[in-house]
A protein has these predicted regions:
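A short glycine-rich, Lys/Arg-flanked "PGG" loop and its adjoining helix->strand segment in the class I
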Residues: 129-145
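Conserved SAM-binding loop of SAM-dependent methyltransferases across substrates and taxa
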Residues: 50-62
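Short glycine-dipeptide loop
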Residues: 63-64, 143-148
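Class I SAM-dependent methyltransferase Rossmann-like catalytic core
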Residues: 1-39
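S-adenosyl-L-methionine
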Residues: 72-118
Length: 210
């Protein structure tokens, strides 16, 4: 496991730029590389606290766009075009409220979700797989045709199966690592593009998407 370095260069950059977390640079890098969102777009951010990704997304979509975040923890005020909803992603009513606040389908869904690790490999892998499945189910309900999903993933015994499931819903799926990820970290990101609207799901309860 990578040694935690609380004051690495990305920590310093985040503090200097007034960002809420160093994780903001991960999303910024991905958006610059893949061009997944445009001005005026609608975006949903899953697990949005403390708000680092919300700020990057707010800037990306501009004043005419809208960003909705969901998290159990409060995010506080980010920007006029950002709405943060408190709630559990497993609750279908929460996803429904997010769709209502968005005012229409989303061009992009983002997820930096990760479970609290127990050190028990099988349990941790199952918890991460559940979060990815929830993210995919919500995206399948909310994304517009051709939309995209960014989701954190760790290397595990479930890795290939998870990626294969994403490929059922998107024409283009790849896995990338960001420079802002800590050295030695197992953290990767799934970049899923060109959503098949015919695969739209009504299931946001964490059950397997089909």
């Amino acid at each position: 496991m990578a040694k935690y370095q609380p004051r690495d260069k990305y920590f310093q950059k985040a503090r200097a730029q007034g960002l809420r977390s160093r994780a903001a640079f991960k999303l910024s890098e991905i958006l610059q590389r893949y061009r997944l969102v445009t001005r005026g777009a609608r975006v949903l951010d899953l697990g949005c606290a403390p708000g680092g990704w919300l700020k990057i997304l707010s800037d990306a979509v501009g004043a005419q766009g809208r960003v909705v975040g969901i998290d159990l923890a409060a995010c506080g005020s980010i920007a006029p075009n950002v709405i943060a909803i408190g709630g559990d992603l497993r609750d279908a009513a929460v996803a429904g409220a997010a769709l209502e606040r968005l005012g229409g389908s989303a061009a992009l869904v983002t997820s930096d979700l990760a479970p609290k690790l127990t050190g028990i490999r099988a349990r941790d892998e199952a918890a991460m797989a559940e979060l990815l499945n929830i993210s995919l189910a919500i995206a399948a309900r909310i994304l517009q045709p051709g939309g995209a999903l960014i989701a954190k993933i760790f290397m595990s015994s479930e890795f290939k199966a998870i990626v294969a499931n994403f490929e059922r819903y998107f024409n283009h799926v790849e896995v990338t690592r960001t420079e802002a990820s800590r050295p030695g970290s197992a953290e990767l990101y799934i970049i899923a593009r060109d959503f098949h609207s015919s695969r739209r799901s009504q299931d946001t309860t964490g059950g397997e998407v089909s």
